[in-house]
């Protein structure tokens, strides 16, 4: 694996990302007339590469760049197939788990099940009132939820 040039030392970060992507995904094709270990790579797409540039490694050749395919059939050639490699078995779907007890009989109802009919929630909504009608400790919602019981006048604590 090659050492990458730090992004801070590159003038154009977008070009650096492109170059790194091409170096990572480059497919080496051996040529008959060239030596792959001693051939210098050049990148002649209009970018300036001087010997004094910030890159420590030259860019990859664009002629040899080809995205890696996911399967051998995508390449269109049988050169990469190995006859001794085993063929993976076809995909078998996992078995379906048995139905849960609550799924078996939908006619049984429990206390925690949602109600069959919709509940009118308008009575629980508080309508905005004027600030001048505010009474501390008094709530219209509490009056709807439970009736106010007044203490009996006959009993007094001493």
From Swiss-Prot:
Keyword Cell division: no
Keywords: Amidation, Cell junction, Cell membrane, Cell projection, Cleavage on pair of basic residues, Cytoplasm, Membrane, Phosphoprotein, Ubl conjugation
Kinase listed as a keyword: no
One matching Pfam family: Sorb
Segments of skewed composition (Pro residues): 86-99
GO CC, any one term: lamellipodium
Region described as Disordered: 28-158
Domain SoHo residues, every copy: 1-46
Source species, domain of life: Eukaryota
Alanine amide PTM sites in chain numbering: 153
Composition skew (Polar residues), residue ranges: 50-66
InterPro entries, A to Z: SoHo_dom
Expressed in which tissues: Expressed in duodenum.
Subcellular location: Cytoplasm, Perinuclear region; Apical cell membrane; Cell junction, Focal adhesion; Cell projection, Lamellipodium
PTM info: Ubiquitinated by CBL.
Basic and acidic residues bias (residue ranges): 71-81, 100-136
Predominant cellular place of this UniProt entry's protein: cytoplasm
Function comment: Adapter protein that plays a role in the assembling of signaling complexes, being a link between ABL kinases and actin cytoskeleton. Can form complex with ABL1 and CBL, thus promoting ubiquitination and degradation of ABL1 or with AKT1 and PAK1, thus mediating AKT1-mediated activation of PAK1. May play a role in the regulation of pancreatic cell adhesion, possibly by acting on WASF1 phosphorylation, enhancing phosphorylation by ABL1, as well as dephosphorylation by PTPN12. Increases water and sodium absorption in the intestine and gall-bladder.
Subunit field text: Interacts with ABL1/c-Abl, ABL2/v-Abl/Arg, ACTN, AKT1, CBL, PALLD and PAK1. Interacts with ABL, CBL, DNM1, DNM2, FLOT1, AFDN, PTK2B/PYK2, SAPAP, SPTAN1, SYNJ1, SYNJ2, VCL/vinculin, and WASF. Interacts with PTPN12 and WASF1 via its SH3 domains; this interaction may mediate the partial PTPN12 and WASF1 translocation to focal adhesion sites.
Domain notes: The first 2 SH3 domains are required for WASF1-binding. All 3 SH3 domains can bind independently to PTPN12.
Entry protein name: Sorbin and SH3 domain-containing protein 2
Gene expressing this chain: SORBS2
């Amino acid at each position: 694996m090659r050492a990458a040039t730090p992004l801070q030392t590159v003038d154009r970060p977008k070009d650096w990302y492109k170059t790194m992507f091409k170096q990572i995904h480059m497919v080496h094709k051996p040529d008959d007339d060239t030596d792959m270990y001693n051939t210098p790579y050049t990148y002649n797409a209009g970018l300036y590469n001087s010997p004094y540039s910030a890159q420590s490694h030259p860019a990859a050749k664009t002629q040899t760049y080809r995205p890696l395919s996911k399967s051998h059939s995508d390449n269109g050639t049988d050169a990469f197939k190995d006859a001794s490699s085993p063929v993976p078995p076809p995909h078998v779907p996992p078995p379906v788990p048995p139905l849960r007890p609550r799924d078996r009989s939908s006619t049984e109802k429990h206390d925690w099940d949602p109600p069959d009919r919709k509940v009118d929630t308008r009575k629980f909504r508080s309508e905005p009132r004027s600030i001048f009608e505010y009474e501390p400790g008094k709530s219209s919602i509490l009056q709807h939820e439970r009736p106010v019981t007044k203490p009996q006048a006959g009993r007094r604590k001493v």
